[in-house]
């Protein structure tokens, strides 16, 4: 949200569709859902104009303005299945990352009953525990699952991530997370990084809502 129109991959996709649209009649049908998978709104019509209107609506619904980044962000994935494993939990990491200061702490609440969710993710983190190394390997040999390892470690360059989860502690460590049993323990650990005077931001639907810094 916010800068979708400035992203190279997005621009390439739009350019590709424009080329296709020169030779074909196209009609777009976009449906926007809420957290319960119910329809919020439907957009239809010209493939690009309808898409732009849908993007504006999504930003209004799921974009949450914030005045400044917080020292500590506490984000819940929003329950099952959004927190079924680390693979899915990474979406909440992405969104909460937008709301935290450099060097801050993000506390993620996620059950992760199915573990990491990807053997390729585990393997990539075991072999290349830095985003630069993972990126270099992906450029040589892109593997689904390993790309999540890059996404996770890239975010960890900015903030400390503490996981409140039923995930096995050894597996959490292998996946580069600090893991604790409850929020109280997470807050005590967070104080090691940000001290005792800090601002907290709560994200009860971390996988859906996107913090947008007010200009």
What are these regions (language model features)?
Residues 1-5:
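Short, small-residue-biased leader/transition segments that mark boundaries at the very start
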Residues 6-81:
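Membrane-embedded hairpin module used as a gating/binding unit in multi-pass transport
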Residues 19-23, 64-68, 98-100, 153-156, ...:
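Solvent-exposed alpha-helices and their adjacent loops that cap or buttress functional pockets
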Residues 53-62, 91-95, 144-153, 181-193:
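A short, acidic, amphipathic alpha-helical segment used as a generic capping/interface helix at domain edges
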Residues 71-76, 107, 201-202:
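Structural motif
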Residues 78, 111-113, 166-167, 205:
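Short, ordered loop/turn segments at secondary-structure junctions
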Residues 83-162:
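C-terminal catalytic subdomain
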Residues 165-215:
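Extended hydrophobic packing segments that form well-structured cores
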């Amino acid at each position: 949200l916010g800068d979708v129109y400035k992203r190279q991959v997005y621009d390439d996709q739009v350019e590709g569709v424009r080329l296709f649209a020169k030779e074909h009649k196209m009609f777009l049908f976009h449906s926007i859902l809420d957290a319960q998978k119910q329809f919020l709104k439907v957009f239809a019509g010209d493939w690009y104009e309808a898409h732009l209107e849908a993007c504006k609506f999504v930003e209004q619904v799921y974009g949450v303005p914030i005045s400044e980044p917080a020292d500590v962000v506490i984000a819940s994935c929003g329950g099952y299945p959004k927190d079924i494993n680390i693979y899915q939990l990474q979406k909440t990491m992405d969104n909460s990352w937008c709301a935290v200061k450099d060097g801050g702490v993000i506390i993620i609440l996620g059950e992760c009953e199915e573990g990491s969710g990807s053997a390729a993710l585990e393997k990539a983190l075991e072999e290349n525990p830095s985003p630069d190394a993972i990126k270099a390997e992906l450029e040589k040999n892109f593997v689904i699952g390993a790309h999540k390892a890059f996404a996770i470690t890239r975010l960890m360059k900015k903030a400390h991530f503490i996981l409140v989860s039923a995930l096995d502690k050894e597996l959490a460590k292998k996946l580069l997370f600090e893991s604790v049993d409850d929020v109280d323990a997470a807050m005590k650990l967070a104080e090691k990084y940000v001290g005792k005077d800090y601002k907290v931001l709560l994200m009860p639907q971390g996988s859906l809502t996107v913090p947008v810094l007010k200009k």
